[in-house]
Amino acid sequence: LSYRLMPSENWNFSVFGKYYHQFVGGPIATSSNQSEYVRTTRDVSSMGYGAAGTYFILPGLQAKLSYEKAYRLPTIEEMFGDEGLEMGDIGIKPENSDNLNLNLSYTRTFGKHSVYVEGGLIYRNTKDYIQRSIADLSGGKSAATYINYGKVLTKGFNVSARYGFGRWLSVGGNF
């Protein structure tokens, strides 16, 4: 569900909501050598939301700001394993994060030449980060499993540039 407001040609604003739902059922190993199984089910739901806005500071120069409360639901392999080298954890929680992005972009065309440059800042505050780890089993064997690691903070930036000539050449890159 989303709503977009455009009060002028220079700026717009949108808000949105997301409903995450996951129901799974399958066998879970009940012994350390993975020889005995029991059928297990799990039902998880969460609400995500966010807002985004753009504003043209000058013709061709645009600022973008967005925030999202997001979730990443565990995969089937993370919950149930692969019956070989990976053990699942049916109790693993979804990752949830607060994501913030701030971008500035500039575009200009002169004659047949066009230039586009964009730079952005990224901030992610992730809780219950799902991490793959190695667990020791009986008999000197080991297997991969998944755990909720805790809090992970990500800060970064990105830069991209593109040059175009007419309709037949476009060269760009990003970092």
Q: Residue locations for each model-derived region?
A:
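Membrane-embedded beta-barrel scaffold of Gram-negative outer-membrane proteins
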Residues: 56, 62-68, 94-155, 164
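Extracellular loop and loop/strand-boundary signature of outer-membrane beta-barrel proteins
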Residues: 1-2, 30-40, 84-92, 142-148, ...
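Hydrophobic, lipid-facing positions within transmembrane beta-strands of outer-membrane proteins
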Residues: 1, 47-51, 63, 88, ...
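Outer-membrane beta-barrel translocator domains and adjoining extracellular loop/strand segments
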Residues: 1, 25-34, 75-83, 129-138
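Transmembrane beta-barrel domains of bacterial outer-membrane proteins
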Residues: 1-5, 155-166, 174
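Transmembrane beta-strands of outer-membrane beta-barrel pores
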Residues: 5, 19-25, 67-73, 80-82, ...
